[in-house]
Amino acid sequence: MMVESASETIRSAPSGQNGVGSLSGQADGSSGGATGTTASGTGREVTTGADSNGEMSPAELLHFQQQQALQVARQFLLQQASGLSSPGNNDSKQSASAVQVPVSVAMMSPQMLTPQQMQQILSPPQLQALLQQQQALMLQQLQEYYKKQQEQLHLQLLTQQQAGKPQPKEALGNKQLAFQQQLLQMQQLQQQHLLNLQRQGLVSLQPNQASGPLQTLPQAAVCPTDLPQLWKGEGAPGQPAEDSVKQEGLDLTGTAATATSFAAPPKVSPPLSHHTLPNGQPTVLTSRRDSSSHEETPGSHPLYGHGECKWPGCETLCEDLGQFIKHLNTEHALDDRSTAQCRVQMQVVQQLEIQLAKESERLQAMMAHLHMRPSEPKPFSQPLNPVPGSSSFSKVTVSAADSFPDGLVHPPTSAAAPVTPLRPPGLGSASLHGGGPARRRSSDKFCSPISSELAQNHEFYKNADVRPPFTYASLIRQAILETPDRQLTLNEIYNWFTRMFAYFRRNTATWKNAVRHNLSLHKCFVRVENVKGAVWTVDEREYQKRRPPKMTGSPTLVKNMISGLSYGALNASYQAALAESSFPLLNSPGMLNPGSASSLLPLSHDDVGAPVEPLPSNGSSSPPRLSPPQYSHQVQVKEEPAEAEEDRQPGPPLGAPNPSASGPPEDRDLEEELPGEELS
């Protein structure tokens, strides 16, 4: 039925166009001779037109191609119709012609035959063969046309030289430029035809097929900037311009039998290449853009590192980059889930940028302040209740003038150690990074409730590798309160930590020791035995017993309240930055006497909010002197052992009396954590 309709279409079409006779009666199997005759006839027509006019426009050349395509398409349809209608024909001829397409069919254009008819007539292998033969024949005709034009130019040069009237080189250059522009237009028409075929779904080019015949088109002659070099007499004196063109690699006088045997000139046109986007959508790009994308990422990918996928929440192991690219195209294609993850990552980046802007502004203000003379300080010196009779306890003077650089007026130093986040020469790296939990307690006591914070930034903590600014006790309590029956096993608490926070998923599991430590330490967590085993509940009254801490009560709570009020604005990044940027005056030997240097040794750089008891130094029994009040304001804080020391040693070190040890164990800070638990 399909072949009959095609035959009726061909018979009803006009057959007497431009001297081309009807071929409806030629239904026999002589396709090879007819094809060869047609191709040679078309070549003669092109040659005759070129000889008569001297130049041929792209429209005329396209007109010849359309005529030839119409004629051969009719012949091809009639041959197939006759082959299918006569079952007595041998099947070997049909199998041989299944892939082979007559050469002249390659000149078919979308205006002559619709895509639906091409899909009905030709199989996919025939479409591939059709495209290749079309490119080969187009290239062959272009090269013949180019050869004729060069021969005409050569003859004109010889005749003008013999007549003694040399034509100006500018005129020859303009003529050559016009001819090259015609070639470029033909090449663009061919590329547009290929793209139209691909958009209509008729053909899917492989990269080697797409870049094969197109590379043989002469691109060096298309560039107008190369024309002045061609006409500057680069050849021998008296040599015609045609020979100089040949030296540039543009000699196309030698013809080849097939289009596949053409040698590529030095400069070739950019081939079409298929580049697959990461979400699996193919697109057609030029080789220049494709090569630039490969130069940016020669052997790496931003989402691939250490053998695993860095897509948020994925962590799929991939052996090499090729397997990762395959995983990226299949698992993280353009869908709703990936789009939502991208939106979450955008929010993470925005929050980090806002935080970075705030910290940068704070740093600029600090640097501007440290390079200026201090203004008149407001006196604020109110000593807290020191314990009388304990000679080993020293006063810590917090002075704003302790941070001044060289060249500024500085108050005289005393035997007391100034609480500044500097790094003494004898302080090791272990003590610098050992007080991580302490630097978060002061700010955590006065922040918003953990439930509202987690509700607002749930996606942020779930996907970003950022440690949550909460204590383990508050996190354990929140995990238990979120359950309907208000009880969890230890394994369920671990699962809540890893489910809610990406930090605990991606770091080492030392935090589990801290969870167990806090569960056994605080009286608010009650262990209950039931049918499932041991579960943990929260005694809310016990948890809220000392929150917020009151000024009257344990000296530890008083110390934490004052340190939180004084240094609540100093977060971890601020103190770490100050510790690394050591000023010359603070590191000078004149800043620290032997007593203050020895008392600084057990201090870590981030224990501003929780001072540690210093080691006794020589002559430290006498009370230290205070800094002059006209230069600084002092906050005198009684030093106590750090909470980490309380966890390891209940008694005070070196025989010093510990007031907090005399009280009951529940007077300890509720937010006490495992010592040295800070994760890298």
Curated annotation (Swiss-Prot):
Regions of compositional bias (Acidic residues) in chain numbering:
668-680
Q: What residue spans carry the region label Disordered? A: 1-56, 262-306, 407-445, 602-680
Query: What residue ranges are annotated as transmembrane?
Result: none
Listed Pfam families? Forkhead, FOXP-CC
UniProt superkingdom? Eukaryota
Notes on the domains: The leucine-zipper is required for dimerization and transcriptional repression.
The protein depicted here goes by the name Forkhead box protein P4
- What is the species of this protein? Homo sapiens
